[in-house]
UniProtKB/Swiss-Prot annotation:
Name of the featured protein: tRNA-2-methylthio-N(6)-dimethylallyladenosine synthase
Radical SAM core domain segment(s): 143-377
Co-factor note (free text): Binds 2 [4Fe-4S] clusters. One cluster is coordinated with 3 cysteines and an exchangeable S-adenosyl-L-methionine.
Catalytic activity reported: N(6)-dimethylallyladenosine(37) in tRNA + (sulfur carrier)-SH + AH2 + 2 S-adenosyl-L-methionine = 2-methylsulfanyl-N(6)-dimethylallyladenosine(37) in tRNA + (sulfur carrier)-H + 5'-deoxyadenosine + L-methionine + A + S-adenosyl-L-homocysteine + 2 H(+)
Assigned GO CC terms: cytosol
EC number(s) given by UniProt: 2.8.4.3
Length: 457
């Protein structure tokens, strides 16, 4: 009987990428296949996030729920990976003794060996070391699932923002060799991938030798240009970037590389210089706005998303008003916004915080409502326009429809004969937007690129 692995992912797209790699590693070494049901699994893995306290506690809550599965099946392997694992280490086993494996983001490639040692010794295995970029040398070829794919180009972060635990859980910035990244993407393109998202905690800090042993360094802008030259790749996205390292060379890339989408996720975190300084972000609001102005001079239709932290220690009403002024000026398409959550071991955790939680919650609700209004306004403005999308899959709610994403990352559902689905998935098509919903769009198929004009009957 085929053995199965269940992976639950918390947090960012880096974790989503790592979860896919866990499945790939165990599939290649152990023959495991992915399941969406923990009750059917022989291996259960939690890929964790420690950016916010709520996500961290959710992990232990979920561990408690699978404990009875372990009691019913002592051969079941339960593992905890990701940033909580890096932060807590063996303390996870002390708190939940039924956990068999604890591994960090840099050691997921060692999962098969850790499982073997657990079975041989009967003892929990903990490996949260930082072997830099070693894991990429031990990962099997990626298994393609659709025309879009994530590709990790670097690991770690060296910015040490005062509130952030990532440098302590993922280590310092280390870039993958240029050849490795391009080889992986070329392999994905050969398997039908048309769109890649380049991943890193701070992708625009990417620096790598042009070739093995080369003293000539390729930066992130140059990497994008190389990726654009790979046959079959039609769209390039990336996340996450840092305003401090948004160079003029990277800005110029938006003029030189049409395949680079007109959508940017650029976390600002706050709209007050005083708070940004306390956060140790390394830029001012004016410097952030200058980057956006330069980009929109090249791409007037550039859509912008961001991250915002409300209620950072010392935040006044004036500080929050400055944040809202920035939101109105930048016209953000989306914002991942949260109330500040102090993380143990970070400098900000020692700052005095005298703002009542109800005030923070009210500010967050105001921010999110304003962003939602802007999202709807942008969606409404797209009605009647022709948008080029990459068809990714059948629509989730209606099997007679297909779904894809616009350049500004909106999901578009459109009707198409079922007989045409296999042909259209993976194609770039033009759709006319006919209706805007809060979090998606509805369209009508107009044209299939590199193909005959589409028909809907």
């Amino acid at each position: 009987m085929t053995k199965k692995v269940y992976v639950k992912t918390f947090g960012c797209q880096m974790n989503e990428y790592d979860s896919d790699k866990m499945v790939d590693v165990l599939g290649a070494a152990e023959g495991l296949v992915k399941t969406d049901t923990p009750e059917d699994a022989d291996v259960i893995l939690f890929n964790t996030c420690s950016v916010r306290e709520k996500a961290q506690e959710k992990v232990f809550s979920d561990l408690g729920r699978v404990r009875e599965l372990k009691e019913a099946n002592p051969n079941l392997i339960i593992g905890v990976g990701g940033c909580v694992a890096s932060q807590e280490g063996a303390a996870i086993v002390s708190r939940a003794p039924y956990v068999d494996l604890v591994f960090g983001p840099q050691t997921l490639h060692r999962l098969p060996q850790m499982i073997d040692k657990r079975r041989e010794s009967g003892r929990a295995q903990v490996d949260i070391s930082f072997p830099e970029i070693e894991k990429f040398d031990h990962l099997p070829p990626a298994r393609v699932d659709g025309p879009s794919a994530f590709v990790s180009i670097m690991e770690g972060c060296s910015k040490y923002c005062s509130y952030c635990v990532v440098p302590y859980t993922r280590g310092e910035e280390v870039s993958r060799p240029l050849d490795d990244v391009l080889t992986e993407i070329a392999g994905l393109a050969d398997q039908g991938v048309r769109e890649v998202t380049l991943l890193g905690q701070n992708v625009n800090a990417y620096r790598a030798g042009l070739t093995l042993g080369s003293t000539e360094i390729a930066d992130f802008a140059q990497l994008i240009e190389y990726v654009a030259d790979i046959p079959g790749i039609e769209r390039i996205r990336y996340t996450t970037s840092h305003p401090k390292e948004f160079t003029q060379r990277l800005i110029d890339t938006y003029a030189k590389v049409p395949k680079l989408v007109s959508h940017l996720h650029l976390p600002v975190q706050h709209g007050s210089d005083r708070i940004l300084m306390a956060m140790k972000r390394g830029y001012t609001v004016l410097e952030y706005k200058s980057v956006i102005r330069k980009l929109r001079a090249i791409r007037p239709d550039l859509s912008l998303s961001t991250d915002m932290i409300v209620g950072f220690p010392g935040e006044t009403e004036e500080d929050f008003d400055k944040m809202m002024a920035l939101v109105h000026e930048m016209k953000y398409d989306t914002s991942f916004s949260f109330i500040y959550s102090p993380r143990p071991g970070t400098p900000a955790a020692n700052l005095h915080d005298d703002t009542p939680r109800e005030v923070k919650l009210k500010r967050l609700q105001h921010l999110q409502a304003t962003i939602e209004e802007n999202v709807q306004r942008i969606s409404d403005s797209m009605v009647g326009k022709i948008e080029r999308i990459l068809v990714e899959r059948p629509a989730r709610k209606d099997p007679n429809e297909l779904a894809g994403r616009t350049e500004n990352n909106r999901v578009v559902n459109f009707p198409a004969p079922i007989a045409s689905h296999a042909r259209l998935i993976g194609q770039m098509v033009d759709v006319k937007i006919v209706k805007a919903y809060p979090h998606s769009l509805r369209g009508e198929l107009v044209l299939v690129h590199d193909d005959a004009p589409a028909t809907t009957h």
